[in-house]
């Protein structure tokens, strides 16, 4: 690869890393605090279990993104020195931003309810654009598309796996609080299904990050891990659609969200509008893509 391309990759990694370390934390704070103020009567009421889950998950992931930013600084040095590990390290680090910021920017339908831009969504844009640019600079022709498509699908699945793993806890606590929600999960299948899907979603999330690294490193294991992530998403998400058909899970409910706190007029989600069913379908799509000979041959040939 030309030294000029390596230099551009290094600059992208450096700037993205500095953004993740010094700028994004403030954007996450601003976005999450706006939501929490509404859930605690402008900071005067005790915080319940549901917003507490939002808080802890958001700020834990903010720490992950800062740590990924540090890794990006190391990757920038690696690009300059033409180290093979720089590219996979940079990609998996960049993936943390769109996956995490999609969650912090969209919970409670903030951008839909308020018709306003969530500050933390900036990290989604920065991370995704940098992610794609590094792939374009690293690969050419067939190799580029063979990597771009499955890695993008893995990132899309990651946004869902992140949100749904958190919902595995929050959805339980929404049924009367911490203790009452746990009790409800014993008898109510629509609550109990979250005890099934939540842990699986967390495992899918971890797996897809490892898959991104291995695919970027041209390891055959990346293909297998991608298959595992896709199948895991389908098996975890689709049952929730049938056991927990809530209007708030319907893409058709976006206009209903904007009217106020309650979701009205959205109706029961169908397989075409259910976020859970569509997430499962996305997992199946990834598996189909990986099984196509063009992608399979490219991704199972190690360098």
Give the location of each predicted region.
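Topology signature of small-to-medium multi-pass alpha-helical membrane proteins
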Residues: 1-303
């Amino acid at each position: 690869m030309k030294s000029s391309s390596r230099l551009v990759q290094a600059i992208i990694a450096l700037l993205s890393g500095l953004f993740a370390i010094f700028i994004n934390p403030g954007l996450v704070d601003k976005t999450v605090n706006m939501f929490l103020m509404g859930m605690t009567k402008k900071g005067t009421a005790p915080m319940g279990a549901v917003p507490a889950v939002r808080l802890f998950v958001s700020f834990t992931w903010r720490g992950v993104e800062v740590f990924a930013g540090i890794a990006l600084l190391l990757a920038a040095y690696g690009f300059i020195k033409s180290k093979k590990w720089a590219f996979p390290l940079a990609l998996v680090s960049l993936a943390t931003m769109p996956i995490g910021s999609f969650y912090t920017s969209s919970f409670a339908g903030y951008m839909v309810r308020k018709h306003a831009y969530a500050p933390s969504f900036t990290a989604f844009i920065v991370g995704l654009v940098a992610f794609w640019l590094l792939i374009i600079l690293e690969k050419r022709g067939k190799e580029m598309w063979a990597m771009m498509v499955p890695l993008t699908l893995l990132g899309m699945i990651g946004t869902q796996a992140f949100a749904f793993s958190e919902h595995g806890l929050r959805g339980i606590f929404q049924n009367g609080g911490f203790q009452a929600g746990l009790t409800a999960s014993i008898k109510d299948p629509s609550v109990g299904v979250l005890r099934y899907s939540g842990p699986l979603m967390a495992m899918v999330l971890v797996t897809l990050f490892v898959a991104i690294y291995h695919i970027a490193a041209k390891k055959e294991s990346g293909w297998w891990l991608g298959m595992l992530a896709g199948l895991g998403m389908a098996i975890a998400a689709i049952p929730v659609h049938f056991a927990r058909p809530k209007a708030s899970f319907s893409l058709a409910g976006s206009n209903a969200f904007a009217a106020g706190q309650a979701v009205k007029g959205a109706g029961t989600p169908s397989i075409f509008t259910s976020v859970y069913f569509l997430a499962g379908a996305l997992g199946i799509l990834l598996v189909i893509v990986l099984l196509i000979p063009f992608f399979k041959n490219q991704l199972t040939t190690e360098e």
